[in-house]
Amino acid sequence: LFLDSNKLRSNILVMALDRGEPARISLVDAGVNWYEVKCSAELVLDSTAEINLILHPLTGGREEPFHIRLDRLPVREGRMTRVRMEFSMLSPVKLHIRIEDLGFGDIFPSSGLRWEQDLVLEGA
């Protein structure tokens, strides 16, 4: 894999449960042009107001964790909070994350809350 200055040098993963087991799910793969990174994912949160991401360098080195707090997220029963995460790159080393509370169907309507955060990806 050839990594020129336009290529993302790290995978961006989210820590989640997959069929009840802890898993590291890839959201953005290394090797793509940074300016082409635009993706989204929906997560069901399990009684938490935090999303845990991992920056996994393709060239080796230490993984870097990122914790995103969702301040003011309404407290709901376990697994009754759905959020949409959208990712885009603002530069070769700056990731923009937008998160939106989707609620949980008719049971728990969306709060309308949104969070945005920019992360600088060291070694990206």
Tell me what each language-model feature is.
Residues 1-124:
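Acidic low-complexity intrinsically disordered segments
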